[in-house]
């Protein structure tokens, strides 16, 4: 009797992994309070990288360029100069 020695090979070629397929989480930058809105002191007004918007009256700038209210009041986004913007907080008249 004959004995057959059969050898089977893979029908699909092995596929290497790709170097793509990752992405960083969104940083949730941008305006956090709208123009004319009432805010309390310490409220974050605008999160940004760099100074896209500058701090105006009663607004401070954090270490990561976040703009925050220094006092309670109303938010006002304004233009100054030809191509710059600033955000200010004005106290509410009582």
Swiss-Prot record:
Protein keywords = Ribonucleoprotein, Ribosomal protein
Tell whether Ribosomal protein is among the UniProt keywords: yes
**Swiss-Prot/TrEMBL GO biological process terms:** translation
Entry-linked InterPro entries? Ribosomal_bL27 (IPR001684), Ribosomal_bL27_CS (IPR018261)
Q: Gene3D superfamilies under this entry?
A: 2.40.50.100
Describe the PTM.
The N-terminus is cleaved by ribosomal processing cysteine protease Prp.
What GO annotations for molecular function exist for this entry? structural constituent of ribosome
Q: Which Pfam families match?
A: Ribosomal_L27
GO CC terms: cytosolic large ribosomal subunit
NCBIfam families documented for this protein: L27 (TIGR00062)
Please report which protein family the annotation says this sequence is part of: Belongs to the bacterial ribosomal protein bL27 family.
Q: What is this protein called?
A: Large ribosomal subunit protein bL27
């Amino acid at each position: 009797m004959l004995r057959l020695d059969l050898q089977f090979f893979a029908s699909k070629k092995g596929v290497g992994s790709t170097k793509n397929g990752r992405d960083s989480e969104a940083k949730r930058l941008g305006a956090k309070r709208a123009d004319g809105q009432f805010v309390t002191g310490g409220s974050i007004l605008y999160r940004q990288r760099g100074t896209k918007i500058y701090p105006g009256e009663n607004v401070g700038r954090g270490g990561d360029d976040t703009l925050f209210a220094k006092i309670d009041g109303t938010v006002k986004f304004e233009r100054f100069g030809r191509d710059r913007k600033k955000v200010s907080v004005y106290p509410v008249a009582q």
